[in-house]
Amino acid sequence: MTKRTFQPNNRRRARKHGFRARMRTRAGRAILSARRGKNRAELSA
């Protein structure tokens, strides 16, 4: 049987997809801006 590929880890999740990770790059800031434009309840992980 194959192993499950999703092995949850909150630190990795935040570092890769968190707010500060998004703010670090221009593309990431564009993502946040788009999510604000859609009035998303959560902007990032």
Swiss-Prot record:
A GO MF label: structural constituent of ribosome
S-S pairs: none
Comp. bias intervals (Basic residues): 10-27
Gene Ontology terms: cellular component: ribonucleoprotein complex; ribosome
One annotated GO biological process: translation
UniProt keyword annotations, A-Z: Ribonucleoprotein, Ribosomal protein
Region Disordered: start-end pairs: 1-45
InterPro entries recorded: Ribosomal_bL34, Ribosomal_bL34_CS
UniProt keyword annotation of Isomerase present: no
One Pfam short name: Ribosomal_L34
Family designation: Belongs to the bacterial ribosomal protein bL34 family.
Protein name (database record): Large ribosomal subunit protein bL34
Organism listed in the record: Micrococcus luteus (strain ATCC 4698 / DSM 20030 / JCM 1464 / CCM 169 / CCUG 5858 / IAM 1056 / NBRC 3333 / NCIMB 9278 / NCTC 2665 / VKM Ac-2230) (Micrococcus lysodeikticus)
